[in-house]
């Protein structure tokens, strides 16, 4: 979005042509008007904000109005064009925001070096030294000669690129003024050198922020935008990122965000949507806005790769994007993107309902074989959506979340993958889930929200790990465990919500929760129909004396939880392990989970524990 100057390199500060060997003088550095750079940044910021407002108008007013009043091919064509226009505005918002931050960051670095320079010049003036145009410093006679006692002659000191490599000035020039002059000359040289380096670094970035011709914003355009964003992130580290409170508590992060100016927030959202969108404690609406923008950058980034993992994640990201853009049907809660990323097996956190405004908030942790793929984008998100819709029929102020914030174990290679038999991923995921729930508690508008942690399959082990921090999971009142292979503790009260607030669903034909109770002869037969998962269950049972893979069976009487009624599920199939949330396949289980989430767990129909 910036121009080129006949292919020649141009200084971002002076606007003059140059190259790698161009020199910036200290006089030119002193005269740089950083206020003009900041004014230009403000102009790009206003353009970015206008584009964002236009995009919001299209998505929140024009598209819903069109869908609600118009039908037919013409309406569909108009909808497509409006969506395209909204994408254009989103691209303008992103690129203009990057320009704003680039110019502000450049001004920040130049002003820093101007202060270094000015302090050196002021010191030279106070000592009556002369700073020449080339940065050398002339100093007067001083000190006393050892032989005649007369003042030692003055001289001139020139700044060196790396003062630490130069011999101490006292060894070559005993005049006490020589050392002071050398120090001043070095600081002048360092300031000029650092400013020149910043000048050319930002000039390269500004040249790259150039829109392609035409009105369409293609995937390739977003790929280019992702590259632009990465370049600006690297350049602006000292200006912005170092201040992001990654090591602070969620409550402190919330306070940090509240204390920023509007301009600062806009810059963080534009340059670091990946950081802000995944920072626990930041308000949900802010995270959603940041992650929707980062989603487009991730799609562009992965589009440029040609490998199977990238294609799998790309398909999932596009499906999530499609759902975010789709019209919310009557009775459905709005969708919020609270986290997105391509690290590990992929990350995605999706809420149905605003978790900050909701009185009841539930977060569901999926388990074995879950990754950022189409199964997650369709199946796991549907579980959260179904739970939210059913719970909102009981209490409309409810939100339900699908949380893929960790690397769940994968059974890609059959028995060669033993991750599921260990606890490392659960412990790592439990730490992340604990932080996420802390963030929800910090950003929720209610004094005492009702919060529920739901773990399915290996996800229940992850939830169990999250409860083992001091005080348990922050603000969580109820815990739901379904299809659980164990949670790492042997008693419900060890989950720190009270045993009457721990609910367990275990289908009769769920291989994960029942294979361990079978005899070894039956294990051999029963494991085969289930492929790698069945083999692993058999191996886990034979390999130890635990009631289940990860401790005592949560569905057992000894564990002490409240076991609710679930459908037994089809035999000799993994479907029994997957239908706990499905209102069509297991109405009783889905309804029970919804009641617990809505704060009415006391109404859940129980069945006897094993």
Residue ranges and their predicted role:
Residues 193-399, 411-414, 441:
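Long, composition-driven intrinsically disordered regions
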Residues 101, 347, 360-361, 477, ...:
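Residue-level detector of short, conserved catalytic/binding motifs and their immediate flanks
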Residues 341, 353-357, 367-449, 469-610:
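Lipolytic serine-hydrolase domain surface
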Residues 454-463:
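Gly/Ala-rich beta-loop-alpha elbow adjacent to hydrolase catalytic centers
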Residues 84, 88, 95, 344, ...:
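Short, glycine/acidic-rich beta->alpha junctions
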Residues 40, 78, 99, 198, ...:
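Stable alpha-helical elements in mature extracytoplasmic
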Residues 41, 79-80, 364, 402-404:
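Glycine- and acidic-rich phosphate- and metal-coordinating loops
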Residues 1-218, 428, 442, 524-525, ...:
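N-terminal secretion-targeting helices of virulence/extracellular proteins
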